[in-house]
């Protein structure tokens, strides 16, 4: 990760604070995390306070770390997913990888995040691995998908 790469991602949105989420999503696509150097750059370029930036990043469970997360698993816990046992899915994944919800693992490779909505209510409980929809109907298969993403 270079400052030039970060600049290329953030600069097109200079002076557009309403595009914070767009910038964050681009950083997540590239690094699967928000590099700490990007925080200051977003603050300067977008004209937002660090509190405003942190509130958005924490709401979307975007990890701020200089070690790119290899695998970002999102488990929807909104009402329709909750009613379809999203908590069991989350617990199964966390047990399988000795992970804590909403925290990057000690080795920096995995984040299992509880999210408020993935807009996949018809596929409840909804799970995304690195932004891709996956089925949570077979928990063992889900663990295999995550292992493949970590490989």
List each language-model region with its residue ranges.
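Signature of N-terminal electron-transfer/Fe-S-associated modules in redox systems
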Residues: 1-151
């Amino acid at each position: 990760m270079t400052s030039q790469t970060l600049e290329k991602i953030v600069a097109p949105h200079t002076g557009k604070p309403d595009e914070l989420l767009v910038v964050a999503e681009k950083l997540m696509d590239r690094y699967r995390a928000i590099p700490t150097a990007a925080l200051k750059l977003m603050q300067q370029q977008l004209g937002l306070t660090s509190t405003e930036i942190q509130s958005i990043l924490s709401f979307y469970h975007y990890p701020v770390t200089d070690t790119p997360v290899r695998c970002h698993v999102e488990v929807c816990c909104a009402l329709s997913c909750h009613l379809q046992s999203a908590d069991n899915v989350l617990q199964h994944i966390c047990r399988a990888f000795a992970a804590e919800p909403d925290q990057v693992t000690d080795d920096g490779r995995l984040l299992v995040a509880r999210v408020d909505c993935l807009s996949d209510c018809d596929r409840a409980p909804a799970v995304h691995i690195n932004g891709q929809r996956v089925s949570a109907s077979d928990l063992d298969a889900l663990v295999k998908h995550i292992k493949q993403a970590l490989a």
